[in-house]
Amino acid sequence: MKLTRKRALTSIAGAAAAAAFPAVARSATTSISIGQIGNSVAFFPVFAAKSLGYYKDAGLDVTTTSFSSGTLVGTAVTSNSIDIGNSVITDVFALLKANRPVKLIGSLCNGYYVDIIMSNQFLEATKLTRASKLMDKINALKGKKIGITGPGSGTQALVDYLFQLAGLDPTRDAELVNVGVNQAAILQTMKSGRIDGVSFAWPLTMIAETNNVGKGFIEPAEGDVPSMREQIQGVIYAKPDVIAKRKPALIAYVHAIGRTEAYLHRNSGKTRELLKQYDGALSDPAIDALLAAYMPVLPKQPDIDANSYEKALQFHRLTGFAGPAGNTYADVVDTDTMLRAIRTK
C-alpha cells in the first residue's frame, strides 16, 4: 500500500495542530446525536468536550447515548437512530463486511487500549505475571472463562487474535462470557470466581489493580503484543449519507473533539479533574496509572494515520472481523471531513 496520502495528511494536519484548535463561535445551535460504548477511556474526550463547553462553541447541542457493546453502536448508526458512532474500529470493519457502509471521520485512541485482565486467583495458581513470556500467558488462558463485552466486539477480537497466535481456537479452547460494560459488576464477577479474567478496555485494568481484584496480564497498547503496536482503535464514524446531509455538523463535532484532545495534552491538572468526573471509580493511584498509559495514545488531533490504519486492517483481517480484500484507507477514511475539521478556524 502506498502511503503518499499519509504524508500529505500529516503535513496538513501538523500545520493545523499548531493552531491549537481555536474556538469556533456559532450563532445557531444544531442538534446532533452520538453513541459510545460505556465509559471506557477512549470516549473521555467526548465527555470532556461537553464539560469544556466546546460543543456549545461549535454551535452543537449533543445528545449522547451509551451502549453496552460496539455492535449496538453500529446498529444505532446504520438504522439512523444516531448520527455519529464513537466506538472501536472493530465495529467499523464488521459493518463494512456486512455491507453496511460507514466512513471514518476522526480518531479517539491511537492504541489497542483493551487488555486481558486476570483475577488474583488465576495469577496465584499459574504463577504467571505480565512479565512472563507472551506464549506462556496465552496458553495459560486455555480452558478458562474469559469475559468479553459481547459477540463481535473489540474485546472478542483481542481474544481471537491471541489464541490464533498460539494455534488455539477461542470457540473450543476457552469459554467466552458476555459481561457487558458495567465495571463494578465485572470486577465482582471476577472476584467471585465466575470468570477467570476479562478482555476489557481501560480504565478497568487500573481499577482492578488499585482495588486488588486482578492485574493486567496482556496489554497490547503497552507493547506486550509486538504485532499490535501503534494500531488505531478508538474512532469516530458515520454513514456516508449522513455525512453528505449533515457535513457541517459532523465537521463541527470532530473539530470539538480535536480541540479537546489538544487541550487535554496541554492541561494535566484539568485532565485529572475531568477524569474524576468522568469515572467516579477512579482513585488517584488509578488515575496516575491510567494517564501514564493513555496520554501516549491520546491523539493530539483527530486525524487517522495511514500506517496505523493499515495495521488495524491487517489485525482485523486475521481475526475475520474485516473482509479479506478492500477496505483501503482511501475507501474507508473520509479525509475531506476529517481535514476540514482539523483546519477549521
Question: Would you name each region that the model predicts?
Answer:
Residues 7-27:
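N-terminal export signals
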Residues 27-171, 175-179, 196-202, 219:
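Short, glycine-/small- and polar/acidic-enriched structural segments
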Residues 57, 123-132, 223-229, 296-305:
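Short, solvent-exposed loop/beta-turn-alpha elements that line the ligand-binding surface or hinge
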Residues 182-277:
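Pocket-lining segment of extracytoplasmic ligand-binding domains
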Residues 314-345:
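Conserved C-terminal helix/tail region of periplasmic/extracytoplasmic solute-binding proteins
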